[in-house]
Amino acid sequence: MNIRIELNFSKYAHVYDKNATLQNVMAGELSSFLPQNMPKKILEIGCGTGAFTKYLLDKPVQKIFLNDISEKMIECMKLKMPLPPYSQIIVGNAELLNFQMVDMITANAVFQWFKDPKDSLRRLKSYIRPNGILVFSTFGPSSLTELRGIAGINSPAALFSDNEWHNFIEEAGLTLNTSKKN
């Protein structure tokens, strides 16, 4: 991720929810992959305005770290939902930050913005305790093809195939338990 991405998300934070229909659908789908017995300590990468955060806050956890590159996105989230005392905000680029050890890392529609997803997965793995979990969703190469075609634009994000993501996961030393393609 870079400063341009942060600036764009910050600039449009106040209207993000009106335009994030797909991200909200993805958040609902991703919530179905959360474990029955929720881990105690969770890190959400790219919490944004809280589309997936709301699902995490419905679960019994002891500590949740909410990260986003845009402080304005987090401000919008705080206006929508009260954050519990066991939550902690971490503003900054997840590719560059150091995090505490956690039991689970989540990310909804975020990893496509990483400059180097493979390296980022490796780094994030180092913050997951043994037997911990990484639960994430991302866009693929066919995501929004009609819209991109009509607008005549290429995606500013890295849109990798399922096979590429599977390879990144394996190369990072993670084990893929479940994968779903829409």
Model segments located where?
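A short SAM/SAH-binding and catalytic strip from SAM-dependent methyltransferases
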Residues: M104-D116
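Conserved class I S-adenosyl-L-methionine
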Residues: M1-N37, A51-Y55, M73
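Conserved catalytic/acceptor-binding region of the Class I
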Residues: I133-N182
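A short acidic, Gly/Pro-enriched loop at the edge of an enzyme's catalytic core
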Residues: E95-I105
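Class I SAM-dependent methyltransferase SAM/SAH-binding core
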Residues: L43-L97
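Local beta-strand N-terminus motif with an aromatic residue
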Residues: P39, Y86, V102-D103
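A short glycine-rich, Lys/Arg-flanked "PGG" loop and its adjoining helix->strand segment in the class I
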Residues: K118-I133
